[in-house]
From Swiss-Prot:
Pfam families: IspD
CDD domains cross-referenced by the UniProt entry: CDP-ME_synthetase
Intrachain disulfide bonds: none
UniProt-listed Enzyme Commission number(s): 2.7.7.60
Top-level taxonomy: Bacteria, Bacillati, Bacillota, Clostridia, Eubacteriales
Identification of the protein by name: 2-C-methyl-D-erythritol 4-phosphate cytidylyltransferase
Site (Transition state stabilizer) location in chain: R16, K23
GO molecular function: 2-C-methyl-D-erythritol 4-phosphate cytidylyltransferase activity
Family: Belongs to the IspD/TarI cytidylyltransferase family. IspD subfamily.
Reactions mediated catalytically: 2-C-methyl-D-erythritol 4-phosphate + CTP + H(+) = 4-CDP-2-C-methyl-D-erythritol + diphosphate
Keyword field contains Lipid metabolism: no
Amino acid sequence: MKSNYAVIVAAGKGKRMKMPINKQFICIQGKPILYYSISVFSKNPLVDKIVLVCAEDEIEYCKQEIVKKYNFDKVVKIVSGGKERQHSVFNALKVLENCSVVLIHDGARPFVTDRIIEDGIKYSNMYGACACGVVPKDTIKIKGKEGFSYKTLVRKELFIVQTPQCFDYNLIYDCHKKLANNKVQVTDDTTVAEYFGNMVYLYEGSYDNIKITTPEDLIIAENIFKTHKYI
């Protein structure tokens, strides 16, 4: 029987955080950000296995201080990241065995919910590729080279894509394999799928499902924890 996998990507250096440790290991309410990101997938009955991606020099730390310390039994492998995010994801995809649906998630997004995970699996089975996200709250403009606005986009047609981004395994593996032979750089996995002509279904995420990237995000995250009791 095939399994649903979560691939949690935690290999980034997080330079914008301007802290001596990687952002995934910063503690909120006494636990690392990465703990919360893994925990939701670990507890969800529809997720069978988890593969964690981290920097090569942090594999042992993740194994001891995250996986073993918090008894994340669903984490079956820890693989090293690559030069760019797309290489890190492909490294993980290559080790998945007998996979049906794969959910690719940022390690620095601790507020993913069961509903988002379960919808991702459902829509992956229906459409082959999907991603959660939200409609922007602000008006979005395109800025010209000289600094002036030259176009205002229709807000209701825009979508801020989050993670998890969820796929039929064979579809996204084949796309990443083809991409590895090109010199195209992408910032997320929906772009990988779209690059090779696949449609990606977009479904409702959450405004709480933020990626913690800057010191300001840490303040927002602390408030989300206190308000919604994610602990």
